[in-house]
């Protein structure tokens, strides 16, 4: 994924009301940008961090600038725009970067499925194999005690729990079901379920794996010009 036009940078003052952030632009002026992330953003929104933002062509938008990447004061790059996780995963599948998901004939997004009124992020299909249901989760929480350790989720997620139940049902019914962690933090080298944050999610994930749900972890190469989801890393839910 290339950023066209190129991203601009500013310094973060504060994030608030979940969807907004005040920044200081390179000109010295201050302003408010949109934050497409409803999560806790732990470690991703420290005042003084550098913010890389895109600019919308829509002149009717109240906040034309969107926060895409955080460059932390420790030098890490983090894609905080949660919309990008699905886009990057679709690109990675189409480019053949995720070898476990090669060979399918059709790719669909946001398809209704399950008994809990869900929409699957990505549905792959082919004439010679079962359908493949893929739920994508963005990982940006870096542990501050163990180098390289990332966790998901960063807050209790009832929505994520629902998705695990739906994936489990798909696997039990004979479809291929995959939970794909899109690691969008340059400092994360391995991923684990955050038992200390959401014990129910960790429990449901173990049950899902026993039922046949596969877990894939792919890490993105991140720069202020391009992001590519193309490197497999380890997952642990022991």
Curated annotation (Swiss-Prot):
Q: Which Gene3D superfamilies match?
A: 2.40.50.580, 3.40.1350.60
Looking up InterPro entries in the UniProt record yields: SfsA, SfsA_C, SfsA_N
A molecular function annotated in GO for this UniProt entry is: DNA binding
Pfam families named in the record: SfsA (PF03749), SfsA_N (PF17746)
UniProt-listed CDD domains:
SfsA-like_bacterial
Q: Which family does it belong to?
A: Belongs to the SfsA family.
Q: Which PANTHER family match?
A: SUGAR FERMENTATION STIMULATION PROTEIN A
Q: Give the protein name, as stated in the record.
A: Sugar fermentation stimulation protein homolog
The encoding gene is sfsA
């Amino acid at each position: 994924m290339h950023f066209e036009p190129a991203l601009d940078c500013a310094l973060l003052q504060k994030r608030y009301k979940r969807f907004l952030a005040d920044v200081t632009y390179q000109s010295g002026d201050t302003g408010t940008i949109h934050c497409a992330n409803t999560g806790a953003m732990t470690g991703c929104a420290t005042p003084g961090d550098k913010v890389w933002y895109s600019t919308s062509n829509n002149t009717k938008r109240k906040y034309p600038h969107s926060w895409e990447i955080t460059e932390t004061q420790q030098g890490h790059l983090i894609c905080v725009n949660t919309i990008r996780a699905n886009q990057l995963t679709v690109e990675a599948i189409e480019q053949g970067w995720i070898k476990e998901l090669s060979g399918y004939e059709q790719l669909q997004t946001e398809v209704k499925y399950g008994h809990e009124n869900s929409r699957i992020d990505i549905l792959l299909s082919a004439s010679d194999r079962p359908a493949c249901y893929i739920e994508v989760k963005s990982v940006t929480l870096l542990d501050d005690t163990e180098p390289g350790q990332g966790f998901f989720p960063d807050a209790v997620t009832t929505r994520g729990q629902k998705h695990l139940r739906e994936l489990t049902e798909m696997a039990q019914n004979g479809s291929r079901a995959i939970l794909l962690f899109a690691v969008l933090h340059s400092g994360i080298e391995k991923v684990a379920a955050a038992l200390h944050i959401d014990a129910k999610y960790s429990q449901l994930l173990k049950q899902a794996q026993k039922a046949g749900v596969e877990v894939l972890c792919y890490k993105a190469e991140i720069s202020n010009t391009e992001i590519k989801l193309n490197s497999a890393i380890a997952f642990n839910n022991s």
